[in-house]
Amino acid sequence: MVGGSSAQKLTTNDALAYLKAVKDKFQDKRDKYDEFLEVMKDFKAQRVDTTGVILRVKELFKGNRELILGFNTFLPKGFEITLRPEDDQPAAPKKPVEFEEAISFVNKIKTRFQGDDRVYKSFLDILNMYRKENKSITEVYHEVAILFRDHHDLLGEFTHFLPDTSATASTNDSVKVPVRDRGIKSLPTMRQIDLDKKDRIITSHPNRALKTENMDVDHERSLLKDSKEEVRRIDKKNDFMDDRDRKDYRGLDHDSHKEHFFNSKKKLIRKDDDSAEMSDQAREGDKFSGAIPSSSTYDEKGHSQELAFVDRVKAKLDTADNQEFLRCLNLYSKEIISQPELQSLVSDLIGVYPDLMDAFKVFLAQCDKNDGLLSGIVSKKSLWSEGKCPQPTKSLDKDTDREREKIERYRERDREKERLEKVAASQKWAKPISELDLSNCEQCTPSYRRLPKNYPIPIASQKMEIGSQVLNDHWVSVTSGSEDYSFKHMRKNQYEESLFKCEDDRFELDMLLESVISATNRVEELLAKINSNELKTDTPICIEDHLTALNLRCIERLYSDHGLDVLDLLKKNAYLALPVILTRLKQKQEEWARCRTEFNKVWADIYTKNYHRSLDHRSFYFKQQDSKNLSTKALLAEIKEISEKKRGEDDALLALAAGNRRTISSNMSFDYPDPDLHEDLYQLIKYSCGEMCSTEQLDKVMKVWTEFLEPIFGVPSRPQGAEDREDAVKSTNHDREDQEDAVSPQNGASIANSMRSNGPRKVNESNQVRQASELDKDVTSSKTSDALLSCDNTQNDKMPKNLTTPDERAETKQAVSIERAHNSNALPLDGLLPQRNGKISSLSVAGLSNSNPKPALTSGTEELKPNYVNGPRVEIGDNPVIPNGTVAEWFAGEAKVEREEGELSPTGDFEEDNYAVHGENDMEALSKSKENDATADDASAPRSSDGSGNTSHNGDVSGTDSGDGEDCYREDDIDHNKVESEGEAEEGMSDGHDDTEGDMPVLSISVKNLLHVKPLAKYVPPALYDKDNDDSRKNSQVFYGNDSFYVLFRLHQILYDRILSAKINSSSPDRKWKTSNPTNPADSYARIMDALYNLLDGTSDNSKFEDDCRAIIGTQSYVLFTLDKLIYKLIKHLQAVAADEMDNKLQQLYAYEKSRKPEKFLDAVYYENALVLLPDEDIYRIECEQSTPSKLSIQLLDYGHDKPDVTSISMDPTFAAYLHNVFLSYQPNAKENPRIYLKRNKRKNGGDDELCTTDEVKIINGLECKITCSSSKVSYVLDTEDVLHRAKRRKLLNQSGLPLAHDSVCSGSLIRQRRTQRYQKLLTGQ
């Protein structure tokens, strides 16, 4: 059929004739004819357009020029298929496609359709169908053409990967056999191979049947050797074919697939021997995972060393190992395995030959430098190329090789996948332009940058040539921010949102007004022109020439839904519509101007309310985090984290160099620059406690605050209690009669009534003097009145009675005493009394009580002048407590204090601070008169008439070791000391009862036994005492506490810090924006405190408090917004501390340790005592330097290597009975000594001689004893001793060797002067 012109009229007969010609042409290729019919059906059903039909027909009829030209007669004009003259000749084979090109094309498709994954997945599905031979190459191209219909560049590049079909139609008998080529199972690199279907003769030899069946495939492989390597590289990145496909690929099931793909039923005939030999060689080459080139491409003369190396390997290894070595080289040459894997495999074969391994590295390097060298060596040295054709491998060997090949492919696929992911990640072209980092790209203006060259430019389907010339595809504007996006660096708060909305409303209204004003002016100008006849009324007016689009839009907006109708009228008859529109515009202008005036007031109010709030961006997050940061868990985690960071090898070495002692290095430090703030904190806590706590809880909480917490910071103690003022008046009225009852013969056994009160009270100095003057009139009670005057300090203090009965604590006392009896390292921690000026007023070893120590204001007491060196000395305690017996009995026994071995005083010796005087015998020793002989044994004062004979009314009360021998009767300049109430004694005395009622408490046996327990002293070497730190020790307070006290101090510090910030910021000069009228900074701070008090009592809410703080301080006020929660949390913690038994013990231990003189205080002793109470808990060393400013340091102690072992002791019941019933038994004397009647006949200064006897006496108590629980045997501990050393006195001699007479005269005059003073006192009755 000759191609005619398009003007020729075609008929149905022409079409039938053409179909008959096609059918005759492909009579042996029925599938091609059927495919042509399918193309026509698709075109008729409009599934394919004209272009698609042309492409498919051209591909189908390739090599049949007459059919293509005949098909042109049925095509429209302009769509004819043009053939070049060279199309008749077989085209040269295409250049093999490189693996990198295929990967690049796939990545380009993925990037182009990153917003539409469906296209990319469909493309992969099409290729997968072709790989599994479910689609022909024509169908693949047709579907890909539809898929890329708007991307002609991709479709054109896709054709580059299509198979070369130039030789498919060499003869009419050729058929198309779809085979897997150029890695189509993963990439669009496709080709078709038509095999020559000449008759073949099948050999009759049964052993050659398999080779004959595979002959065609082997021949095909020999034809594809130029692209085989690229096929395998592309196959690496896809799923492996299943066993059936692999068998198809190797030709093991060739007949079944031949019947499936071919219509021809002709039998295969055997080719010539050369073809059979080639088939054998190709099949043998399968062992090397691919065909091996038949010719060598390297110069054998130039690479004799490499060949020699292969020969050396062959000589060393046996045949199987050598074959394996060559296989490894072949896999590496095909790039199936990497170089490290090759070295690993080869090392298993020749690793035992070090020389071969070294030579192999050189060999491998040389092969990498020369392409084709390694494949040529393998092809030359392989067995089959040498003519040694091995026998067909067994099925087991084939399965092994197949499995090995499968493993290698899986491994290679994973490596290739990782490489592709890295390439894709490095390119990052899958991101949209808005997410690209173009900071390093070329910049032409501040806003525009050039896209990278590798970034895919989307193709515009309708872009014409002029568009390509003028439109920009390579320069993009970098988006830095937009009002549509929220701020990423800072979130807008609700107050800012209100301001933004106001700004938007103002802007919209302003724009409306401006548009109306502009439209009004334009309309007025147009009407003026019409009225002045500048525009003729008989000609239509083009309204767009006089009014802008904005003016027309404004007019349309005026009439809302009828705006378009008004615009039509305006355009049709502007002369009539303009006056009406102008009137409407002026009405709207006035209405919107009036609306703006009204809204300005509303907006001004919104600005006023929200401006300061909008500036606060930190309060929102601060409120969220503050409750978490103030939790106990967070505070503990904070210091533990800091402690762990500081703990390292350097610290450990430092501790080792320091004798394995603790290193004092604070973990946290806080400054307290303003001491006046402590008063504000006190008032805040007291006020909040009144709102939150009951009266009883208020007293306990404020006692911890005023008597423990504030003194550590150097704040003087203050009166405390809920009923201070009322009780002060009551106590003044009752002081006189209470003291008279205390010294009367009927109530002489107790002075509890003298201090009896149901609540705290104050003692007035003038009232005390008046009482004393009245009491002095009674001769029998004169000494008692003197004692009350001298022992009652002239200070205003509140003394709430916090009494506990001995029976309530008998069990606790017994347990603690037992533990101390077995542990000489434990200091007597129980029975600690309140301190005055750093001295303990009274001490009892009976047990740890639940009462809290109460620090008081510093008294004006003066210590006695010491007249000894390192000897025992006696001092006047600030607050002496009267022991058992009457008042007169107490003061009569002050002259002499008996001391037993092992008992030391903290003020006289550098060992145990206090000891207790127990039992009736001890009371008798104390009651010896000063005026009588020192050894006289006067009887003690009689008991009360209705009291029991076993104990006094006050119960277990112990004296103090720190009282001076002369006590309150000394004539020296000693201020009178205040008498402490027995209700504060740590032994837990019962509340005072009236003696007339006879309700005197009776102590239990266990408590009586504990009266004999003496404190166990621990000897501290004087070398540990550091005299250089006296000043620093006096100005600092050290406290060892647990987690509870650490949290307490931290909460106190946080509250102090926030109140300080309020005070500083309120007085800051940079407050111009706050108020127009400047105010006094003190007034600003007072306003903040008033607002805080209103918040605490519920007068105002949090919102009003926050507004007040912002108005006064500004943006820095956010730290004050949670003050109420912080204060409530601190009060709750104070309640927990006041109620916790262990916390009370720690406070008592602190008071006990502070009873020592500052120069005798030892941190190590305090620390070991704290370890006794907290053996398994964290211990914190809290130190406050009372300097200017005060500084608080907190350290979490790490025991390290020196943690002492605090062992718990379980006592045998038998030994316990012996200890309490025998060793500690107490038998009171039935006979009581009468009181001394003539007190003034007793020598007052009898203690002077006794003090002189102990002058220059050194006593060291180091003797220890141990008790065996099983036998109750007491024995001394070896290498322990007591030492008493008295230095001899030397007389001072003059030059002649005689005693100095002048000294004797001076001494005599002093004695006479002293006697005269005593005589005068006797006469005056003082």
From Swiss-Prot:
GO molecular function terms attached to this record: transcription corepressor activity
Gene3D superfamilies cross-referenced by the UniProt entry: Paired amphipathic helix
Region of interest: Disordered: 272-299, 715-812, 844-864, 927-1000
Entry-linked InterPro entries: HDAC_interact_dom, PAH, PAH_sf, Sin3-like, Sin3_C
Major location (coarse): nucleus
Any single GO CC term annotated in Swiss-Prot or TrEMBL for this entry: nucleus
Regions of compositional bias (Basic and acidic residues) in chain numbering: 721-737, 967-981
The protein's name in its UniProt record: Paired amphipathic helix protein Sin3-like 4
This protein's encoding gene: SNL4
